[in-house]
């Protein structure tokens, strides 16, 4: 088992613990963040395999969520909050690059995407889910570029659906 496979195995264990109620969403996010940051692998410059692209997705998603969480700290200086939000947005853009790389590697085959029903007013009509059936992979994005590509490839369903992981995406952290 290589380092990426070990990460995804450990991540699945965290998901299972979260699903059983053994940890909160915040605890799950923190443990996943620690796994990508302190693991023996970092982001890949050359995403030449689906595995590497999906790891980069997880890596940058974890960093983006952590920066966003830090930005909500009470009594933090406005400039510092803004810096953390900018970092969060930067990491989300890197995550979207990894998403596009993965979709292109798959040539959009076995991919289905749609907007998800979400409680957040800010994300309603923006957040969509990408399901890669054969791999059992669920990705999320708000990227208009990715949305455009999914539509052009004919894999985006113009409807809002309940997310495959509805409890997770609609739970605050």
Question: What is each PLM-predicted segment?
Answer:
Residues 39-58:
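Short, charge/polar-rich alpha-helical segments
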Residues 3-30:
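Short terminal alpha-helical segments
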Residues 17-27, 69-82:
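Charged, low-complexity interaction regions
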Residues 168-173:
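Short acidic DE-rich linear segments
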């Amino acid at each position: 088992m290589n380092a990426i496979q070990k990460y995804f195995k450990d991540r699945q264990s965290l998901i299972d613990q979260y699903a059983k109620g053994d940890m909160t969403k915040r605890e799950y996010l923190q443990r996943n963040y620690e796994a990508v940051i302190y693991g023996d692998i970092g982001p890949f410059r050359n995403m030449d395999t689906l595995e590497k692209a999906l790891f980069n997705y997880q890596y940058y998603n974890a960093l983006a969520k952590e920066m966003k969480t830090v930005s909500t700290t009470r009594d933090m200086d406005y400039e510092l909050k803004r810096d953390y939000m900018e970092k969060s947005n930067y990491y989300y853009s890197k995550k979207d690059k990894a998403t596009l790389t993965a979709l292109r590697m798959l040539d959009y085959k076995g991919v289905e995407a749609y907007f998800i029903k979400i409680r957040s007013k800010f994300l309603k009509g923006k957040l969509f889910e990408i399901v890669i059936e054969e791999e059992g992979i669920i990705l999320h994005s708000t990227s208009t570029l990715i949305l455009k590509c999914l539509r052009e490839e004919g894999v985006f369903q113009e409807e809002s659906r309940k997310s495959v992981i509805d409890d997770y995406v609609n739970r605050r952290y």
